[in-house]
């Protein structure tokens, strides 16, 4: 499952930027890194790079033509990929993940600060990073044409996409190119037999279409296999009853007259194919740790019957019913985020699976509560055990998972510094996730309020989603946002609402029903 990003394009007005800045203070998000942290990381980065070429701990894999694929403008590059054909219609997947443990001394200043932060927090006007930029955007980032230490996963997939073999080693790698999703999608659309759209694809520019002309053949051959890997892994997901929820990115664009316009950008197929590589790696990491009896999983319980019933009712209200007997994953895959009703369902689906967290276990721990792996190790939405293992530059727990998995893969004991941290990691990640979620929710309220400020007094169309004690939840069709409107209207009713006021400081939006027969106003 992936969450949507919230972006800001254009010169936002000072009031919005000031409010977003204040949000950091209100949520007590960390600001600048302390001097000892920066000094320690500078020294660590220098030491790692000086010693990397002769490091006995890192195999030389610099001849492999890895590339990174990320959103445009990214500098914290965690992952690089290489795909090659194998015998019997198989595909060999190599996935390099930044070796952050090489740069962070256990118990040091950087480690302590990372535990305090937990994860990178993304806001419309920037981010609050987990690590100092000298690490996350330079020394450990898999930037092109630079040797970097990495954990290199190797997966041999059969013709159906099942994993036949798994390998993991620490290695030196050198990415050949830093590519964007738009560039890769343009390249894939131009391949023989590709089902390219007849109209320009949103998120792909003319510059993206021209970029592939300079790629070497080995890079082109690798990326040409990405859709097939994505399709095979998606088929495996469907077969086990799993589902990935890929929400559109929400973006606020500033128009020439200074108004804020809210738009949604659905993930490109290349993004969804690439996401399957991270899911593949996370499931392999979980299997390794469960087999070894030491690890930390990303767990999520199955939804209860009341939650499922409420979600089904909401889908019916929106005119996109999830029928009894229809597989949940197949239902999600049938939705088109470009349709406002379908988009509302996708957002509602985020509330179906609740209770996600981290579960640590260690068969040799002194604490009896840690000695037994979880009774239900699966991440319910994925229908498989899963671990976070592919974003160590941006998420604390991945650093520990990667170190554990490497030890398990080579038959070495689990590192003592990891085992000692396992009891505390679930709470550290839960705390940082609460801060990140609060920041995301509040920032979304602020930018949605900014987008609706120019619509005060306007009447907008929407759909009544559900009735509540304090009014009716309405999903506006354009812009696609959710509002609470005083009054009562049956779920599923097409309605009109008037935007009566916007509080830019709080992000609150006041609206009233227009000609609602049951309205209280």
Predicted feature locations:
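Alpha-helical structural modules in large enzymes and assemblies
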Residues: 31
């Amino acid at each position: 499952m992936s969450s949507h990003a919230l972006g800001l394009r254009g010169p936002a007005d000072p009031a919005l930027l000031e409010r977003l800045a204040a949000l950091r203070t209100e949520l007590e998000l960390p600001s600048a890194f302390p001097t000892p942290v920066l000094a320690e990381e500078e020294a660590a980065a220098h030491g790692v790079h000086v010693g990397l070429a002769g490091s006995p701990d890192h195999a030389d894999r610099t001849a492999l033509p890895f590339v990174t694929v990320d959103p445009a403008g990214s500098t914290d590059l965690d992952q690089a990929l290489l795909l090659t054909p194998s015998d019997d219609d198989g595909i060999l997947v190599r996935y390099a993940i930044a070796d952050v443990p090489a740069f962070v001394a256990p118990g040091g200043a950087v480690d302590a600060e990372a535990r305090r932060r937990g994860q990178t927090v993304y806001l419309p006007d920037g981010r609050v990073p987990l690590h100092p930029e000298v690490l996350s955007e330079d020394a450990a980032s898999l930037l092109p044409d630079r040797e970097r230490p990495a954990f290199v996963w190797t997966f041999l997939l059969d013709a159906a996409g099942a994993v036949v073999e798994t390998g993991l080693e620490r290695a030196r790698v050198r990415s050949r190119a830093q590519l964007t999703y738009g560039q890769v999608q343009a390249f894939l659309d131009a391949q023989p037999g590709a089902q390219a759209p007849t109209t320009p694809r949103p998120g792909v520019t003319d510059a993206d279409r021209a970029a592939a002309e300079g790629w070497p053949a080995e890079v082109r051959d690798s990326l040409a296999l990405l859709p097939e890997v994505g399709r095979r892994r998606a088929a495996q997901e469907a077969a086990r009853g799993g589902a990935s929820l890929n929400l559109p990115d929400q973006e606020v664009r500033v128009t020439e007259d200074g108004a804020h316009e809210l738009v949604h950008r659905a993930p490109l197929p290349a993004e969804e194919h690439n996401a399957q590589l991270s899911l593949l790696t996370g499931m392999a990491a979980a299997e390794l740790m469960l087999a070894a009896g030491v690890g930390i999983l990303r767990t999520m319980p199955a939804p209860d019957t009341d939650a499922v019933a409420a979600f089904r009712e909401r889908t019916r209200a929106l005119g996109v019913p999830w029928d009894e007997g229809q597989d949940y994953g197949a239902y999600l895959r049938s939705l088109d985020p470009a349709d406002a009703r379908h988009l509302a369902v996708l957002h509602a689906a985020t509330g179906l699976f609740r209770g996600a967290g981290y579960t640590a276990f260690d068969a040799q721990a002194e604490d009896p509560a840690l000695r037994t792996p979880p009774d239900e190790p699966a991440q319910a939405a994925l229908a498989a055990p899963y671990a976070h293992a592919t974003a160590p530059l941006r998420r604390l727990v991945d650093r520990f998972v990667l170190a554990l998995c490497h030890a398990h893969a080579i038959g070495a004991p689990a590192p003592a510094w990891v085992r000692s941290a396992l009891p505390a990691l679930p709470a550290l990640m839960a705390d940082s996730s609460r801060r990140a979620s609060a920041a995301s929710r509040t920032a979304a309220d602020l930018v949605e309020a900014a987008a609706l400020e120019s619509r005060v007094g306007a009447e907008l169309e929407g759909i009544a989603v559900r009735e509540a004690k304090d009014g009716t939840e309405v999903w506006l069709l354009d812009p696609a946002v959710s509002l609470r409107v005083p009054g009562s209207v049956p779920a599923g009713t097409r309605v009109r609402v008037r935007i009566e006021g916007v509080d830019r400081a709080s992000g609150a939006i006041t609206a009233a029903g227009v000609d609602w027969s049951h309205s209280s106003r």
